[in-house]
């Protein structure tokens, strides 16, 4: 049985900027001068006009411009919108506009806002994830236990550093290498995700021993017209492990482009279908690894071999092994403040899920009936508890995962705005906001809002699933006080580009806000 997933467009490289650069850029943008402005009381009519527009697609509109998108499909779509002024120590946020703000919606990746807010507050910005190697001192031959704790940033480079540490201690041969998968308990892959998603790199399994984001990359190159696309593995060694059923084709320069890659569930077989134009750029594809534990050990053996360290038997255990064996090598992840950048700015699902499980693992001792829960379920309990402590209404959301990839998540715009408001009052507020994409500058918003008044002024988390689009975050209008907002659309037949463009128009409308004096009659 093969499960297919789709990639239609080549994603442009995303710009990673330092935290300080992003924060300063957000605060120090020049004031945008415009004569086209609106009062807070005009937000509702302006949004209604946007949703009723009916003309042809264009690029992101400037503030005050009407888009040209046919939006007749919005008649049956569900919109959830909540716009508030940013609260301060002395004043609560004022609601400027609400449309079904308390209703449940599928949030897509906006769910990451809840996960990362709870993690940052509970674990601290300095929290790191440690991968350890322990030596069994009770045996003469060298037996090592490799303890993974779900570091999503671990790559082959870090495995090389671990191997160097072992070599520096004089280890030349390992009789048994045990991969310890017991830190995260629960099913792999995620049972809350759709079968098509778990085959793609963005839906890679989350376990204790994560390496290279548990995905393998390849490039699909167009050849001469009529010839199949050439498959090039990012790691040539993978070509020896996989068989490819290539039914793709190179087409002329005017034909449509699409690529479908399916992975067989029972064997290392990829099926490639679709077409790319002759002379065009290659299409990058990431495929989820089906056996992440074995993949980790296999690649660690390669790193050990590079240090002339021989390995005998390799095993994987999912059973906790409480021993007093000494730690002889270790490597740590970057701090949580850095991990959040990849999670929110680049909308990395695996990072979000690993952070969720870290929350659960760290709090396991304090949770009642923790043994009956998976580590992910424990993490969700901690998120709920932490957000409640921060003032988020407990009934305003129901989470099934930490990333938003599950279609069982239910989140109201009010829950997102309450979270954004709460975290803005905490000492870690600057770190949290700096992890978000900046309009026209970085991450998933790098290509949106360019050359508009929102560029550099809007920091928000994006979210996209089929028929779903969301944007929630902060906005500094040039002539009005800072805002917190959440905009979600569900159940729309419109293409993603149309949904995003419409959301962008609503956000751009907010940049035109100004204070208006009330009539005294």
Identify the role of each PLM range:
Residues 2-14:
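Bacterial N-terminal signal peptides that target proteins for export
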Residues 19-29:
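C-terminal segment of classical bacterial N-terminal signal peptides
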Residues 29-91, 97-103, 165-170:
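Beta-lactamase-like hydrolase cores
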Residues 93, 107-125, 177, 209, ...:
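Active-site SXXK
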Residues 96-98, 346, 356-521:
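Small-residue-rich helix-loop
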Residues 121-136, 141, 312-315, 429-432:
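Short, well-structured active-site flanking segments
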Residues 146-251:
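Polar, glycine-rich mid-to-C-terminal structural blocks
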Residues 249-430:
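A small/polar active-site loop signature that marks catalytic segments
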């Amino acid at each position: 049985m093969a499960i297919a997933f789709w990639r239609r467009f080549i994603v442009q490289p995303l710009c990673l900027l330092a935290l300080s650069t992003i924060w300063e850029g957000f605060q120090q943008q020049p004031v945008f001068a415009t004569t086209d402005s609106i009062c807070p009381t005009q937000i509702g009519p302006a949004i209604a006009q946007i949703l009723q527009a009916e003309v042809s697609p264009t690029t992101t509109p400037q503030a005050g411009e009407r888009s040209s998108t046919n939006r007749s499909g919005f008649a049956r779509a569900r919109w959830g919108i909540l716009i508030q002024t940013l609260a301060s120590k002395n004043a609560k946020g004022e609601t400027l506009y609400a449309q079904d703000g308390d209703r449940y919606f599928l949030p897509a990746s906006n769910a990451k806002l809840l996960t990362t807010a709870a993690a940052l507050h509970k674990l601290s910005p300095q929290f790191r994830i440690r991968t350890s190697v322990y030596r069994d001192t009770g045996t003469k031959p060298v037996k090592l236990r490799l303890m993974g704790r779900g570091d999503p940033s671990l790559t082959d480079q870090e495995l090389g550093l671990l191997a160097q540490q072992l070599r520096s201690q004089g280890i030349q041969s390992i009789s048994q290498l045990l991969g310890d998968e017991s830190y995260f308990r629960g099913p792999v892959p995620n049972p809350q995700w759709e079968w098509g998603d778990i085959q793609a790199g963005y839906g890679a399994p989350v376990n204790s021993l994560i390496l290279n984001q548990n995905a393998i990359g390849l490039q699909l190159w167009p050849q001469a017209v009529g010839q199949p696309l050439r498959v090039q593995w990012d790691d040539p060694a993978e070509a020896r492990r996989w068989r490819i059923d290539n039914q793709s084709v190179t087409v002329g320069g005017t034909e449509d482009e699409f690529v479908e890659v399916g992975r067989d569930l029972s064997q290392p077989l990829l099926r490639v279908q679709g077409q790319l134009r002759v002379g065009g750029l290659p299409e990058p594809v990431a495929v989820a690894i089906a056996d992440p534990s074995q993949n980790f050990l296999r690649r660690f053996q390669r790193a050990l071999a590079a240090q002339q360290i021989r390995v005998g038997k390799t095993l994987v255990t999912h059973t906790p092994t409480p021993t007093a064996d000494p730690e002889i090598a270790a490597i740590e992840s970057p701090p949580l403040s850095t991990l959040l950048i990849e999670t929110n700015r680049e909308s990395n699902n695996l990072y979000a899920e690993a952070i969720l499980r870290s929350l659960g693992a760290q709090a396991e001792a304090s949770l009642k009936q923790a043994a009956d829960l998976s580590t992910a379920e424990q993490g969700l309990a901690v998120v709920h508890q932490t957000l409640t402590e921060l003032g988020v209404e407990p009934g305003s959301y129901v989470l099934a995962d930490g990333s938003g990839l599950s279609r069982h998540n239910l989140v109201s715009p009010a829950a997102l705005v309450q979270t954004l408001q709460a975290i803005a009052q905490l000492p870690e507020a600057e770190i949290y906001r700096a992890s978000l994409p900046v309009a026209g500058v970085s991450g998933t918003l790098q290509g949106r809002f360019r050359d508009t008044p929102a560029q550099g002024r809007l920091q928000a988390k994006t979210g996209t699933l089929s028929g779903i689009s969301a944007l929630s975050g902060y906005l500094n209008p040039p002539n009005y006080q800072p805002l917190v907002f959440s905009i979600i659309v569900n159940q729309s037949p419109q293409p993603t580009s149309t949904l995003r463009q419409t959301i962008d128009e609503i956000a751009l409308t907010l940049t035109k806000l100004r204070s208006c004096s009330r009539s005294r009659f």
